[in-house]
């Protein structure tokens, strides 16, 4: 038997009052997801353990089958693994994300954590300017994906975890800036980056075109470095991972998985859902277990655009769920687990720790199905798992 694990980030949400207390997933037309739910065992899972904040660093690790309580590390260390950046003992990796800030009274407000979906090529131009003007043997910059890059500094580990920018839309940043002597150099580097970016020809051209400038970096993602136990030894199955997410790629490589790097136009994460589906189905010919991760809807959710989220979910249904349903209907040697890693709420513009729905296709005789794939699965008395690792173990051991 082959095992396909599909993680759809950003699908579920909280009920929205102005939408008759429906969620975007309930509003969207999703015939293929609903058909899957009707033919599957449906249940829910708590991917975020107690005492952990919701985020990809926790939920994706959980759905790889590794307990965050034991194996949690920072986003930046996994990004460094993904980018093959060597780290010395005294190196501290940090996520270095280009953002757009907006002046507001005596503060700056986070306007866009993707810097207007900054393409990788343009991000590289700005990153090169930072490396040239403030880089030295103790401060190094490495290009990543789109606005998301990596900075490595010579420093002891920080005592506090830095705030990620994804949940700060509309927030004044002053309250989230790190304080204390250990962060003085970090704040200095952020301030220097703003000066360099303000004077960069790229931003002058954006100003002339009436566009918001890419006027700051946001430094975050510090945490412990982790080497994960090999997936093949943990579950006695070979595995591949299809993703355009740096952190998930880093986790997969740390776990000894074969990582298929799917890129789209201009070096951005692939806009073509179909390319990811085709890659995952191809990997099933070689590997026992294949992970397929679709992350595009998450950023739309965190920007708070409900209508765009509904449209993105409908695209997901047509270009991910539909082709997968058609492909698996023609095979009897593949089981699929479809699950979300955590709630990315468009109404709150935040991650939440809410339980998320899952389905296992095809269902065994007598399994609990559902009329549609939405949040009602979470509220029903269907199969529940207390953690992601418990769900993954049960799925891979044919207990579902």
Protein language model regions, located:
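Feature captures the catalytic ectodomains and active-site-proximal regions of enzymes
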Residues: 1-400
């Amino acid at each position: 038997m082959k095992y396909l694990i599909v993680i759809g980030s950003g699908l579920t949400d909280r009920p929205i009052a102005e939408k008759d207390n429906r969620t975007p997933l309930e509003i969207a037309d999703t015939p293929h997801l609903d058909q899957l739910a009707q033919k599957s065992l449906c249940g829910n899972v708590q991917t975020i353990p107690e005492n952990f904040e919701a985020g990809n660093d926790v939920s994706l690790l959980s759905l790889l089958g590794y307990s965050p309580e034991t194996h949690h590390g920072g986003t930046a260390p996994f990004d460094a693994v993904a980018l093959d950046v060597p780290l010395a003992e005294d190196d501290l990796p940090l996520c270095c994300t280009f953002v757009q800030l907006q002046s507001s009274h005596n503060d700056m407000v986070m306007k866009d954590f993707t810097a207007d979906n900054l393409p990788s090529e343009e991000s590289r131009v700005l990153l090169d300017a930072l490396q040239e003007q403030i880089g030295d043997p103790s401060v190094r910059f490495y290009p990543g994906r789109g606005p998301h890059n990596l900075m490595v500094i010579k420093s002891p580990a920080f005592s506090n975890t830095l705030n990620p920018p994804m949940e700060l839309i509309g927030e004044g940043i002053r309250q989230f800036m790190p304080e204390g002597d250990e962060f003085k150099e970090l704040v200095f580097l952020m301030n220097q980056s703003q000066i360099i970016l303000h004077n960069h020809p790229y931003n002058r051209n954006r100003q002339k075109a009436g566009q918001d400038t890419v006027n700051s970096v946001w430094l975050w993602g510090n945490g412990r470095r982790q080497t994960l136990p090999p997936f093949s030894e943990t579950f006695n199955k070979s595995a591949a991972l299809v993703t355009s997410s740096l952190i998930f790629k880093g986790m997969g490589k740390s776990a000894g998985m074969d990582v298929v790097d799917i890129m789209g136009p201009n070096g951005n994460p692939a806009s073509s859902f179909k390319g990811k589906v085709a890659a995952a189905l191809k990997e099933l010919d070689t590997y026992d277990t294949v992970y397929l991760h679709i992350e595009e809807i998450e950023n739309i959710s965190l920007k708070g655009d409900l209508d765009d989220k509904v449209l993105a979910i409908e695209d997901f249904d047509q270009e991910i769920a539909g082709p997968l349903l058609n492909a698996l209907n023609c095979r009897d040697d593949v089981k699929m687990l479809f699950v979300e890693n955590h709630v990315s709420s468009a109404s709150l513009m935040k991650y939440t720790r809410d339980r998320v729905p899952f389905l296992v296709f095809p269902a065994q005789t007598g399994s609990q199905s559902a009329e549609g794939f939405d949040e009602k699965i979470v509220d029903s008395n269907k199969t529940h798992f207390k953690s992601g690792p418990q769900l993954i173990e049960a799925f891979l051991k044919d207990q579902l």
